Amino acid sequence: MRQSRFKRICVFCGSSQGKKRSYHDAAIELGNELVARSIDLVYGGGSIGLMGLVSQAVFDGGRHVIGVIPKTLMTPEISGETVGEVRPVADMHQRKAEMARQSDAFIALPGGYGTLEELLEVITWAQLGIHHKPVGLLNVDGYYNSLLTFIDKAVEEGFINTSARRIIVMAPTAEELMDKLEEYVPYHDRVASKLNWEMGHLGY
């Protein structure tokens, strides 16, 4: 396997494992795929849910794991035990900014409100030109089909630019998704492409 263009990838995913075994397997598969490509992991910390599965797989594979977690969520009762390096932050805003700062790309596994919020924020940042990093959606068993249908409806109704729809890179398996991310070239029209953005501009 050729050398990856990425050193670290941020993975967004659920703090629960979901009801299907396929979600569990996909998290481990993604962790193993990162290891195979010599990519380190950035994630939201803890050892529960899909977050715990992907981080443990990367850690067991000998790659570096960075868990970024608000101090208020660091108790084992809430998040379990983070493997690898723990980077405490003050709040959720700092968590997202730090994860973005440390990463070369983003991938979302199945998850709930938190995962959706993190995913949509980095998509928005890409649209604005704040970053040029690929955003991948691991669409396990069609989990995100309804979200993609909604986004397509927003394009149809004129709320999302057609070129901005291309920000999202989607695939059903980790290997296929990683192959697509490796080849990704930004070609959408950024809203603020002439601005030199830094994380400080985000108010974090």
Swiss-Prot record:
EC number: 3.2.2.n1
Top-level division of the source organism's lineage: Eukaryota
Position of the signal peptide: none
Record flagged with keyword Hydrolase: yes
Major enzyme class: hydrolase
Keyword vocabulary terms for this entry: Cytokinin biosynthesis, Hydrolase
GO biological process: cytokinin biosynthetic process
Binding positions for substrate per the UniProt entry: E77, R95, K96, G112, Y113, G114, T115, L116, E117, E118, T124
Tissues with expression: Expressed in roots, leaves, stems, tiller buds, shoot apex, immature inflorescences and flowers.
Reaction(s) catalysed (UniProt annotation): N(6)-(dimethylallyl)adenosine 5'-phosphate + H2O = N(6)-dimethylallyladenine + D-ribose 5-phosphate; 9-ribosyl-trans-zeatin 5'-phosphate + H2O = trans-zeatin + D-ribose 5-phosphate
GO cellular component: cytosol; nucleus
Pfam families reported for this sequence: Lysine_decarbox (PF03641)
Cross-referenced InterPro entries: LOG, LOG_fam
GO molecular function: cytokinin riboside 5'-monophosphate phosphoribohydrolase activity
PANTHER family referenced in this protein's UniProt entry, alphabetically: CYTOKININ RIBOSIDE 5'-MONOPHOSPHATE PHOSPHORIBOHYDROLASE LOGL10-RELATED, LOG FAMILY PROTEIN YJL055W
Family assignment from sequence similarity: Belongs to the LOG family.
Annotated function: Cytokinin-activating enzyme working in the direct activation pathway. Phosphoribohydrolase that converts inactive cytokinin nucleotides to the biologically active free-base forms.
Stated name of the protein: Probable cytokinin riboside 5'-monophosphate phosphoribohydrolase LOGL10
Lineage: Eukaryota, Viridiplantae, Streptophyta, Embryophyta, Tracheophyta
